């Protein structure tokens, strides 16, 4: 599998990637010949050659279909897995190449810092007049918080991810130019071993993962990857500051992490008070175990003897205090360590950590106490010639404690507004609660939200579940500390009453502090086009409400609002979603500023462009002026977690990019663009007409039947990808009730990617017909928001394939003739205007590296897609009862997901 079309040209820096892909492709061929047969490999080559020829001629996939249709399920599954294995090694090669390129930049010196890194950000800031003093004033305000979620978009098993890490490690080791031939042979053997083990491991689990499984999955990235790179991130920033300004700064904590795993109740009956408590306990154990292990390793390093070197009086005093506090632990210290005060203190610190883990006497009351002990050691080492005798290792642990505390990651809780509304309606005995005016409901809720009256207790399941949740949060605050808890997010928030409802329920559940306030940050999530449009009014009403304003004063007069990228796109199309999000941020910031409240945004981004994915650096550059202000809180979902944080070097790069982008956007936001006043009405028109086209398509009669026939949504619903159902429980199959993730996933699998572009062409055409073509060209050239929007659409279009999409569409029978021509026409219109406004002859002309990456994969995705159509038709003929066909279809879904590198 190592032939390539001559039209694939690699730039000079990427030639090593080409060599890796060829070498690993040949290795995949060897694997297939060994594990299946030489005849099987020859058949794969015939299919691959046909797919490449089809791509080069841009013809319908009839030849591929004749080669692939009618195969036995097991034979079809083997074919899919063969092509999927190729994607696997290409993805690995590209990730390792990113590490290679990073090292190339580092070797070249700081005269050419890697773009979007910390060195690059600081150089740009200095060039724009930022002084060291200004940087020092801003750093304490920087707060970057990736929040990991367990949405069912990760289509790769944990067992396979671990083997992939082994393959990555062998390739990274091979980057060392000093490796001997024997060592290189060993590296190749390690890669082959992990690759073969992957081939012999089923692609998907036979059972749906539990919340505990998802918690373990996310915990792997937190404890095994990010735990290790956090100190390196701070060391990199220190070095960048010194290189740029010639001086150093004492760095505050800039990064922390959040999670939804175990706390996201929205539509998931498996998440409740028990998973909240269990998650917090599990995370506490995980991070304290890491600290204990690291202290154990430090014990042998910190063996300084008082006969040779002194220690600080403060450290000696702390040692004496701990010996009195923990006499049993002190007695267990070995006599031969009696002249090693650092080691003796280390023994007692481990005893305190163990007591913290066991909830026993002598426990640390808070992470700050452990930080204090570590700082004592650092100060003593620095004062006594120990900078090169353990100081570096101790400081790395200190950075970890500052970043992860005793909780590892802050746990958010999320629930849909209607669940709260039903509970309050039952508690107040008002069956018509939903039909009452929102202002009237808010007035009724005021006394309960303020604590003047107690919300009645009701003996029903809904109220009992919510009471248990708030009781669990109150207990968690006492047991784990306030830092362990993130926000309480209200999905599908529509008005002020939705927020006051949560405040009233929290009081009833016992989540009240000693001052009588509810110690909870309540975050409305605006996720439909209408809610984004009305969000400013909702926040104005909320901040003007005396009860809520009193609550907010106790929270530091800071309000967070979450912006939903997924459902707004499903609701009104991508143009209306993007523009609605942009306008909402501007209007919300203005409203909050007028009322004296600091507003921060929580971006609910998904993995794909359709759901707000893409490069953080470009997203922040395109964000409204003043919307960052030192803070970035963003969800990291599904396959994004593995892509960004699966390898230590790439995790470090991701953290650097986010931190650098926040620094740039905060200290030197983009200069105001006076033409934006003229551009906004143009964008209003684009969004409005795009929405009309999009809703006209997805709202057409029989559309949902077409969707269910022309995509593999029925297969996706049967897959065991996550603990949450694909639609909200107890609701029908209408589009409004389908989750955004399977909606996008299904269209991506069908290669049409409708949510990522449909309606954009109509919107742009309408603006041109209204006489705005020159403005659109200016916007594409000079407005980062619009340029990023068009670039993202171009990327989505590049990953689609109209010929393959037509094969899927024909599965819908008579509905094909009604819907597919509309897809074809809108696609042509969208491609035309995107290329025209970007001034490009072909999509992604400005990003040849991304274009090459997509072209590398497409000929290998096509056979899987064609096979998927054939299998889907046969499986549906059995009414979905043939398990062998289903297993082959699941393999197809996994293969396409690996190929396009997007699920939902």
Curated annotation (Swiss-Prot):
UniProt xrefs under SUPFAM superfamilies: Phosphoenolpyruvate/pyruvate domain (SSF51621)
Superkingdom of the source species: Bacteria
Reactions catalysed: oxaloacetate + phosphate = phosphoenolpyruvate + hydrogencarbonate
Entry annotation: catalytic residues: 151, 570
Protein name from the UniProt record: Phosphoenolpyruvate carboxylase
InterPro entries for the chain: PEP_COase, PEP_COase_bac/pln-type, PEP_COase_Lys_AS, PEPCASE_His_AS, Pyrv/PenolPyrv_kinase-like_dom
Stored PANTHER family: PHOSPHOENOLPYRUVATE CARBOXYLASE
Cofactors, names only: Mg(2+)
Family: Belongs to the PEPCase type 1 family.
Organism: Xanthomonas campestris pv. campestris (strain 8004)
GO CC terms, sorted: cytosol
An individual GO BP term: oxaloacetate metabolic process
UniProt EC number: 4.1.1.31
Keywords: Carbon dioxide fixation, Lyase, Magnesium
Gene Ontology MF terms: magnesium ion binding; phosphoenolpyruvate carboxylase activity
Leading EC class: lyase
Keyword flag Magnesium: yes
